[in-house]
Amino acid sequence: MATQPVQVTQSSAFARSYKKLHNRQKQDVNSAVQVIVADPLVGEGKRGDLAGVYVYKFKIQAQLMLLAYEFDPATRHLLSLGTHENFYRESKR
């Protein structure tokens, strides 16, 4: 029984944030995305205005980063990436 590959899509906000990173930082983000692809429930589920959104926290060079995403069994949609400062306010947009 072969499993279908998971499709990963990204929002324009995530793409903008990702583009600004250095290569080493991009590797850390790629590792975090692989963790999310393997187990989408690893992130913390949000409530209220952000219901249905999960946030995975990881570190890049001692800086805590947050990656917001939504998922269903076949896809992972990356919404935003950034530090905690104003992260949730920007995610609501």
Predicted features along the sequence, with ranges:
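A short, surface-exposed loop/turn module that caps and links secondary-structure elements
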Residues: 34-59
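Enriched for short, Lys/Arg-rich terminal
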Residues: 1-7, 16, 26, 41, ...
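Hydrophobic/aromatic residues within well-ordered alpha-helical segments
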Residues: 10, 21, 25-28
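Generic preference for hydrophobic/aromatic residues in regular secondary structure cores
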Residues: 7-8, 47
